[in-house]
């Protein structure tokens, strides 16, 4: 396969975001400072040194805005404030200052496809009549059939069930329906409405003016809807369970790109231009590349890589397809293994089927080999951090945390659980609070006598930051060494990428300055012979230049 390197000046660009390693913080589960069992901003500030020592370039903070918390904070009632459970605006300002002092950039989650149903704009729409200016800011429609008892169309929700809910008029009679592609408490806004555009423009400027370095645009591919809201033609069920959901008239619609261009102009107007990352779940890398054209977003989440599983042909196909699609638009790739929406990859890699469905719809209920998953996760870390472009680390990934799959049902909070009729447990298992220190829960996440909002497994005493920091063979030590080498050796930050000839189930490539990565996904050991001198391995068992199965190594060519 050909070398992947552009001739449009990309190699000379030094924008920090092109090769950044960004650490996702889910604030409820990061660190609790005030003994209420829920993580907060002061907790994040108290643990920033861990992230600096880890060697990340930026943090991305999941929603911390005022919210009824019907979807973990992704139902936002006030975009320009902080939910009291996390702190206040002054805490956020201090966090920005602390992070910047450590050389860490800050990105915030930005949810613009929908608001909370408690947002003042939606509350005003509820009290306004049909056809009013207030209702035009969302999608209110009359129903179909006798008495309007059927939804306006057949669209289905990402969390299961139909994407429409019906209002009750003040006199008790049935009213109009409103659209929500996610939970009923998350009504979709109408991006053709000027009031909506101006409101979100103000939100963008509010956070940029406070010193935020960038925004991660949640559910960007959902923001456009085809005119007339035509039927999608799907069978009943969950949006993400459908094989052709990406072709829906409410997903990846072309005119949503004008919204992204609007924000890019705002961000580019600052002395140090701001950065946008988009979450776009679309059909293939070619469609994905449209979101990172020069006048749109800077980078985008790579779900194809996340879903590739532990398959050499599939991983190779995704890497090649991603680099081919992004090169013409001059955008860097990003690589991600886990997030707050996915079953943790260590657990996925310990299963017979190692891929994942998006949005946490993982109901496989099969036994997991965590030893195998850990071995593969270590190799996947070296693979991911060796690829050209940027990378994401989801909190706890650097500790080798598995999915918590035995949370008591009465504690599950993800709306997927209820909306799916208790068929899909949702995403709570990847959101369990982090273990920092100690021999028993809450492992330093909170005070010893506090019960976290989700319980931690008792055996996580082996996976605390303190325990792993002193163990040279731990997952944390591996991540720290890999990130240190990634910063130290400039070749990892260059766009050069050349495939090396290896057996089908062995992935090998060369980056700049003769840096090489070899990953053995086969059932047999692989001899890497004279490919180079070992810099770092996912396993210490690299005798006689032999790479065991499910292991990876970084090499320096002679």
Listing of model-derived features with the role each one plays in the protein:
Residues 1-532, 537-558:
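Active-site and adjacent substrate-binding regions of carbohydrate-active enzymes
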């Amino acid at each position: 396969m050909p070398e992947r390197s552009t001739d449009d000046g990309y190699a000379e660009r030094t924008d920090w975001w092109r090769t950044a390693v960004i650490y996702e913080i889910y604030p409820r589960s990061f660190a609790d400072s005030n003994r209420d069992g829920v993580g907060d901003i002061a907790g994040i500030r108290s643990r920033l040194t861990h992230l600096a020592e880890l060697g990340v370039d930026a943090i991305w903070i999941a929603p911390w805005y005022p919210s009824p918390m019907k979807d973990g904070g992704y139902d936002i009632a006030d975009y320009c404030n902080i939910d009291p459970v996390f702190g206040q605006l002054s805490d956020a300002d201090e966090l920005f200052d602390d992070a910047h002092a450590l050389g860490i950039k800050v990105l915030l989650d930005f949810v613009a496809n929908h608001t909370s149903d408690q947002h003042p704009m939606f509350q005003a729409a509820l009290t306004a009549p049909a056809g009013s200016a207030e209702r035009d800011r969302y999608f209110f429609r009359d129903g179909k059939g006798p008495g309007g008892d059927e939804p306006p169309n057949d669209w289905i929700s990402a969390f299961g069930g139909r994407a429409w809910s019906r209002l009750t008029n003040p006199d008790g009679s049935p009213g109009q329906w409103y659209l929500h592609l996610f939970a009923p408490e998350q009504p979709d806004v109408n991006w053709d409405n000027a009031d909506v555009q101006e409101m979100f423009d103000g939100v963008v400027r509010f956070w940029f003016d406070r010193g935020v370095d960038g925004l991660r645009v949640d559910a960007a591919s959902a923001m456009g809807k085809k005119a007339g809201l035509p039927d999608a033609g799907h069978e009943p069920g969950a949006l993400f369970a459908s094989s052709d959901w990406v072709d829906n008239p409410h997903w990846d619609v072309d005119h949503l790109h004008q919204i992204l261009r609007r924000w890019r102009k705002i961000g580019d107007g600052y002395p140090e231009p701001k950065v946008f990352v988009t979450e776009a779940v679309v059909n293939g890398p070619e469609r994905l590349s449209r979101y990172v054209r020069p006048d749109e977003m800077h980078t985008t989440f790579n779900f194809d890589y996340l879903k590739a599983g532990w398959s050499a042909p599939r991983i190779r196909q995704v890497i090649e397809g991603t680099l081919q699609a992004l090169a013409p638009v001059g955008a860097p790739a990003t690589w991600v293994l886990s997030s707050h929406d996915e079953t943790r990859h260590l657990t996925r890699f310990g299963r017979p089927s190692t891929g994942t469905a998006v949005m946490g719809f993982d109901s496989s209920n099969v036994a997991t080999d965590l030893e195998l998953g850990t071995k593969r996760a270590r190799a996947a870390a070296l693979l991911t951090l060796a690829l050209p472009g940027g990378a994401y680390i989801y909190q706890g990934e650097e500790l080798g945390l598995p999915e918590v799959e035995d949370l008591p049902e009465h504690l599950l909070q993800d709306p997927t659980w209820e909306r799916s009729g208790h068929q899909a447990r949702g995403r709570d298992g990847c959101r369990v609070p982090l273990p920092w220190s100690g021999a028993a829960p809450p492992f330093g996440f909170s005070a010893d006598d506090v019960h976290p909002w989700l319980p931690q497994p008792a055996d996580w005493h082996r996976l605390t930051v303190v325990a792993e920091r002193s163990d040279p063979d731990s997952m944390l030590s591996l991540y720290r060494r890999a990130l240190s080498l990634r910063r130290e050796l400039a070749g990892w930050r260059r766009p050069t990428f050349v495939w090396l000839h290896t057996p089908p189930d062995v992935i090998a490539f060369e980056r700049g300055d003769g840096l090489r990565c070899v990953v053995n996904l086969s059932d047999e050991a692989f001899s890497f012979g004279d490919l180079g001198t070992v810099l770092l391995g996912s396993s210490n068992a690299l005798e006689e230049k032999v790479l065991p199965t499910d292991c990876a190594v970084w090499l320096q060519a002679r």
